[in-house]
Amino acid sequence: MIAARHYRKWWLSHIWPKDFSWLVPIESSSVPGPPECPALDEKFQSCQTVDNISLARRVGPPALLYSTGIDSSIAALVARVSCIPTGGHSSCPREYFLSAKTSLVSLVPTMDWTAAEHESGVTQNHQHRMQTEDHDSFAGEIQKLPSPPAGNTGGQNPSDPADEQGWPQRVLNEMKDMLLLLSSDGKILYASPSCKSITGYDANQLQQNALERFIHNDDKTTFAEEMNECITTTRPVHCHFRFRKKDNSSNTSCLLEAHGHPHMKTSEPNDSPENHNEDCIGVFLLCRPYPTRGSQLLDSFLEHKIENVRLNQRIAQLREEEEEDLASGQQLYAGDSTGDSGFRHNSHSGRSNSNQSSFRDTTGSGEENESSDTLTNDDPDSRSYLENAADELGQTEDMSHIEGIEMLTGLHYGDGERSQGLSTGVRQGRLIRYDMESAKLDQQARVIQDSDRKKRQKGEYMCTDCGTSDSPEWRKGPEGPKTLCNACGCKSAVQYTLFSYSSEMSS
């Protein structure tokens, strides 16, 4: 303490100049200042060593001290100066601006805290430039600082109690999420005003109603389980549910994300341990819409899945209709063929119908196909019927092929009309008439010629040893390739082997 006092005395006497002539009073204010301090007034009235300090009195709390590199006791001492009137200036107001020429100490005033001038209790702080002995760069300017807390105003008027009471309601009105206060049985005791923008209901329409009344039927069970677990375990709850909106005509609902916690009432400490339990007074639930973009993506994904299922069902339905059409066409062909062949027996016709259906059913099993082939090979009537049905089906396919050509080219292809160079853009292109009957005869003649050629090819070879011509295989003989039948060729090979072996043994 002694060292600090000597340091303070040395600092005040050597660093600060001994000039106190630049005190500049500021105009007084109508608002009363801090109370008088006679003891400190007498002490500082006799202090003439405080130089290069501008003291000016004004209304408001004490000035704020900014100090750098000086002793804390000196900073406290200088801070005390700003609250005390000086001698010889009785007309000065009751607060001072304190500013140092050096960079060690800088004291600047705070803003006025007057509730009468502003509803928030803060008025504008008018800046003043300190007058010093010489106008150099060390002269500081008064800075604007935030207003002090309400508890540090000292003698200032406190803020309006009515404004303090309106803050909770203002917070609830500005809140975007929906706040619900539920009873232990799930009844809505309070709903924040934001429920109108989220659900479409007013607060009075939701209050005194069960929350489950507005929840989707599929989510009621899950929500009830979450709430019961929250009340039983006294743990926070986090769940999602669909809330029905007010527009019941379209049966729309919004997906909400809810966070909440129970409010428990503890028994009095004087109660017995048997009665010392916690009762749930209510549950605070804060609900907000689930992210809109994610819900839209989820809805679109579900819509695409549903559309895919619907299209697959439609494809299966069309396939069934196509199979029914094919079956009806086959039955029509079967009826025509049975009308043409009147000599068939009823039992044979029934069996042939079953064989035809099994023959045309590509989705059947291998056993059914095998049984149909067996019946076809055994029964000549069924074989002839199947051949006729296959010919008629081939003609039908040919007709459909011809119709497709006519639709694409515009020619009467079935009547024999042909195009030469028209489709390729040749100038000499023309339409010609092709005789379908002669074409059919030429085709039949070509088929006969092909069959005769195959027969002639089969009968060209003749065994030079036995003279046969129906051998399945032909072998090379003394006269060249394919001159011996299979039997004669084997016999000739054996004889040649024995002859060569005997000649080797004799030699």
UniProtKB/Swiss-Prot annotation:
<dbReference type="Pfam" id="PF00320">
    <property type="entry name" value="GATA"/>
</dbReference>
<keyword id="KW-0804">Transcription</keyword>
<dbReference type="GO" id="GO:0008270">
    <property type="term" value="F:zinc ion binding"/>
</dbReference>
<dbReference type="InterPro" id="IPR013088">
    <property type="entry name" value="Znf_NHR/GATA"/>
</dbReference>
<keyword id="KW-0863">Zinc-finger</keyword>
<feature type="zinc finger region" description="GATA-type">
    <location>
        <begin position="463"/>
        <end position="488"/>
    </location>
</feature>
<dbReference type="GO" id="GO:0006355">
    <property type="term" value="P:regulation of DNA-templated transcription"/>
</dbReference>
<dbReference type="InterPro" id="IPR035965">
    <property type="entry name" value="PAS-like_dom_sf"/>
</dbReference>
<dbReference type="InterPro" id="IPR013655">
    <property type="entry name" value="PAS_fold_3"/>
</dbReference>
<keyword id="KW-0479">Metal-binding</keyword>
<dbReference type="GO" id="GO:0043565">
    <property type="term" value="F:sequence-specific DNA binding"/>
</dbReference>
<protein>
    <recommendedName>
        <fullName>Blue light receptor lreB</fullName>
    </recommendedName>
</protein>
<comment type="function">
    <text>Probable transcription factor involved in light regulation. Plays crucial roles in fungal growth and asexual development. Involved in conidiophore formation, sclerotium production, and conidial stress tolerance. Positively regulates the fungal pathogenicity towards maize and aflatoxin B1 production.</text>
</comment>
<dbReference type="Pfam" id="PF08447">
    <property type="entry name" value="PAS_3"/>
</dbReference>
<keyword id="KW-0805">Transcription regulation</keyword>
<keyword id="KW-0843">Virulence</keyword>
<keyword id="KW-0862">Zinc</keyword>
<dbReference type="InterPro" id="IPR000014">
    <property type="entry name" value="PAS"/>
</dbReference>
<dbReference type="GO" id="GO:0005634">
    <property type="term" value="C:nucleus"/>
</dbReference>
<feature type="domain" description="PAS">
    <location>
        <begin position="170"/>
        <end position="234"/>
    </location>
</feature>
<dbReference type="InterPro" id="IPR000679">
    <property type="entry name" value="Znf_GATA"/>
</dbReference>
